[in-house]
Amino acid sequence: MCTVVVSVAPGSAWPVVFLGLRDEVADRPWDAPAAWWPELGDRVEGVRDREAGGAWLATATAPARASVVLNRREEPAPPAGGWTTRGALPLSAAASGALPGGRPTTRAFNLLAADADGARVASWDGAGLTTETLAPGVHVLTHGSTDDLDVPRVARWLPRFRGVEAPTGPPTGPAGASTGPDDGDRGRWEPWLALLRESTELPADHDEALVRADLLDGRWFGSLSLSLVAVSADQVRHEHHRLDRASPLVGHFA
């Protein structure tokens, strides 16, 4: 299941930043972020799932927004008309700012939606749809509730992420320029990236691992990509990296 670490800092130049690890079956085809949906125009980009046609993570400009969907662990009964893809949710949230309402026809999900005003999480567990506004500070989302300490990797790593400096902006500026006063500042993402590197010392199938890999019904399932996202009043930045199954993070953040 995916993992998202998000920092909410009201009043700052970049009020919401988040790190997302996308976990998926390795042979499910997907594409790196781009404007894959002509009906949404050039302002909406996302990590496209070719199989279902939606997005795992989407960003939009004018106004600046970002949204990412995570699968929950519950298995609701299928609706009469069949399932719709969860991948439509971040596209809608990024494009319009709207969160889902009514009774969703998707499988269970957590949906993070971020803009300059903060971050909200819509959760559907098959029984009810709830929405919460994240308090200032650092939070971790997985397949359970927000900051769910019953999830082993949340229990281990949430205190660690809260114990280091959170990023203050995008990791890179236009054309790869540094965002900080010194070369290599990278928006002060290094403390979070250092924790990711530390987490890879665990076996990839360990319950507390952040960067994950395991066999699921004979198919390799694991962390396929890493996204670093920052949202300001008028900009959204998304730095995206494919991860190597054999050596995740090596070569990107060594």
Where are these regions (language model features)?
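N-terminal nucleophile
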Residues: M1-A254
